[in-house]
């Protein structure tokens, strides 16, 4: 079965992510561990953690994915911001391990005036420090593919390969975001473009290291370098790009997570649209 789900709210109590996932008929879910646009960290009670584990077992929703705060910038040249980001990631990863969350997705950082090579080095050094403080046994640390706006690092397979290289023995991997890669210049909505991107991933990162797919259409044109998500089939990617991913013999084994605009019942509608694109037999490569 192809697992399709959405990003859900974790407000009030973390265990409620499973209630919210069940309400929309999600097979898998993603959520924030704390407010993504605030440095404030909310400590979770033992009771809340126990409820989280209990509801996960009861609902059968799996895999479970946490997304990092948007404030973190592991590439920053500002030592205060970078240290704050490192400590924030450590805190979030420790909670992921405690709750046995499967995947932790992060936007690695922005160069903001640095050369790309310097920004990449800063990210690698930051992650080394993080892994010296947190040993990942249950959770995979996933770099998200990014659109390339405002100096984002992680927009190409080459950049992601550099970020992955020092951590081959760790629980690391990649989360592919369809909107981001399309906006970054990978034309995944035609056959040649999709298989070219698939081949690049395979050679430079290894398909086995791709763990999650963020399923988002794009409000902006191809190669726009802008991160603007749209409902499935209503953006410039169109249905074809999602059909390629959902029916690919490898990608269809992964969780597909919607991060489309949160209006009315659109998570339900978007999941239905994705499910209609699934064929019985995968397309072999």
Swiss-Prot record:
Zn(2+) 3 binds at residues 180, 227, 229. Zn(2+) 2 binds at residues 144, 177, 214, 259. Binds 3 Zn(2+) ions. Its EC number is 3.1.21.2. The keyword Ribosomal protein does not apply. One of its GO terms (molecular function) is deoxyribonuclease IV (phage-T4-induced) activity. Its cofactor is Zn(2+). HAMAP family: Nfo (MF_00152). Belongs to the AP endonuclease 2 family. This is Probable endonuclease 4.
């Amino acid at each position: 079965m192809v697992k399709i789900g959405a990003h859900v709210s974790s407000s009030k109590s973390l265990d409620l992510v499973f209630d919210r996932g069940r309400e929309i008929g999600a097979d898998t879910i993603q959520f924030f561990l704390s407010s993504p646009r605030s440095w404030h960290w909310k400590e979770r009670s033992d009771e809340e953690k126990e409820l989280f584990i209990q509801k996960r077992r009861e609902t059968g929703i799996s895999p479970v994915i946490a997304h990092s705060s948007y404030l973190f910038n592991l590439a920053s040249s500002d030592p205060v911001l970078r240290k704050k980001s490192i400590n924030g990631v450590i805190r979030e990863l420790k909670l992921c391990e405690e709750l046995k969350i499967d995947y932790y997705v992060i936007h690695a950082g922005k160069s903001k005036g640095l050369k790309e090579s310097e920004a990449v080095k800063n990210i690698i050094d930051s992650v080394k420090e993080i892994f010296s403080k947190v040993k990942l046994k249950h959770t995979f640390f996933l770099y998200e593919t990014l659109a390339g706006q405002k100096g984002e690092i992680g927009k190409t397979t080459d950049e992601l390969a550099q970020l992955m290289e020092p951590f081959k023995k760790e629980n690391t991997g990649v989360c592919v975001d369809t909107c981001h890669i399309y906006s970054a210049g990978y034309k995944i909505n035609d056959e040649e473009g999709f298989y070219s991107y698939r081949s690049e991933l395979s050679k430079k990162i290894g398909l086995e290291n791709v763990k999650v797919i963020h399923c988002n259409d794009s409000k902006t044109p191809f190669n726009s370098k802008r991160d603007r998500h749209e409902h499935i089939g209503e953006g410039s990617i169109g249905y074809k790009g999602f059909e390629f991913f959902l029916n690919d013999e490898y990608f269809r084994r992964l969780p597909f997570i919607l991060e489309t605009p949160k209006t009315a019942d659109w998570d339900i509608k978007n999941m239905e649209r994705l499910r209609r694109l699934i064929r019985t037999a995968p397309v072999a490569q």
